């Protein structure tokens, strides 16, 4: 399996520096590629999933890859695709986020230092110790401010007259230096990132060529949206996280189960690692029974993230909920310990906050008014509804937010 050919066939390709030469090198020798993740949250999400699948593909094709966690660059903040200055994230938050991101990555990837396992690095290791004066003297001459001002991440902010701090302006220098450092000490010759990173990546390519004259490449992926134009991993309820403490395996399964018909085959190629034979069968199934095809995709993608046991539980729970119309014990569960409250009753908005489906009672009201809440699969229309003991069947009710998020609410025995 040739890396670039498979990369293009799956739909990962957007733009590249010297694609012909990169293809030749990747077909004839082992490349060393790096992908970076900044530490802005305690988990990666579905929007990061393509980059993770690319890391797996590199490994499967016999290439070496490096994951760089941006412990240092997160302190600065990437201005790409941003309309305003990022909130400064504290060092403690960054360390917590690094821990969570490592958990996300280890679900999919084996980290080691053997021939084609993935190496995990943190750019704090080399950026935190940089002397600013020395950095300007040694590397500042290699960067053109004229070119930096033409970068989309900078240009768009200036055109909209939105603030761009000198702090953020430095981000692209540090990312370029990351590539130079990785090339010098790890023989890294390829950086892969999203299409919004093209300017930062090409600056890194130029820096390496100017300072060492080594042959390096940049490769970017497209921004993936669904058929409605929404970014992958974004829902009305927030991001779809990869870590199970932030998004249960069942809700993760449901996200994929509820994709639009037009996205089924495309997402199978992007995220499912289906073989050609499997994809052919899936395509045939899609035209005969689209819902069954969606279940197969949801199962496969959940299996890759959460393992076979959790994927089986999620599939069985979905079948019980939507085909047999029964609540399933494998749903995320909240237990009410004091049933005396239920004798008087709990306002629905208070219950939504208590079980974590709404952050505030006001948000709970908005969800109800938007027809987003169901109890035991019956739509809640009354924002003043009081949930009482008689609403529970065998001491259980199912509270649902939209089609994808379900909580089993139990009364403690």
Curated annotation (Swiss-Prot):
The residues the record assigns to binding L-tyrosine are: 34, 171, 175
Catalytic activity reads: tRNA(Tyr) + L-tyrosine + ATP = L-tyrosyl-tRNA(Tyr) + AMP + diphosphate + H(+)
- What's the short name of a Pfam family annotated to this entry? SYY_C-terminal
Q: Where is the S4 RNA-binding domain?
A: 346-411
GO cellular component terms attached to this protein's record? cytosol
Please list the GO biological process terms of this entry. Answer: tyrosyl-tRNA aminoacylation
Q: Name one GO molecular function term.
A: ATP binding
Where is the motif 'KMSKS' region annotated in this sequence? 231-235
Instruction: Please give the InterPro entries that the UniProt record associates with this protein.
Output: aa-tRNA-synth_Ic, Rossmann-like_a/b/a_fold, S4_RNA-bd_sf, SYY-like_C, Tyr-tRNA-ligase, Tyr-tRNA-ligase_bac-type, Tyr-tRNA-ligase_bac_1
Q: Where in the cell is it found?
A: Cytoplasm
For this protein, what is the EC number? 6.1.1.1
Q: Where is this motif: 'HIGH' region?
A: 39-48
Question: Which residues are involved in binding ATP?
Answer: 234
Keyword annotations of the record = Aminoacyl-tRNA synthetase, ATP-binding, Cytoplasm, Ligase, Nucleotide-binding, Protein biosynthesis, RNA-binding
Top-level lineage group: Bacteria
Q: Does the keyword Ligase apply?
A: yes
Q: Whom does it interact with, and what assembly results? A: Homodimer.
Please state which protein family the record places this protein in: Belongs to the class-I aminoacyl-tRNA synthetase family. TyrS type 1 subfamily.
Q: Sorted alphabetically, which HAMAP family does this protein's record hold?
A: Tyr_tRNA_synth_type1
Q: What does this protein do?
A: Catalyzes the attachment of tyrosine to tRNA(Tyr) in a two-step reaction: tyrosine is first activated by ATP to form Tyr-AMP and then transferred to the acceptor end of tRNA(Tyr).
Protein name (Swiss-Prot/TrEMBL): Tyrosine--tRNA ligase
Organism field = Orientia tsutsugamushi (strain Ikeda) (Rickettsia tsutsugamushi)
- Primary gene name: tyrS
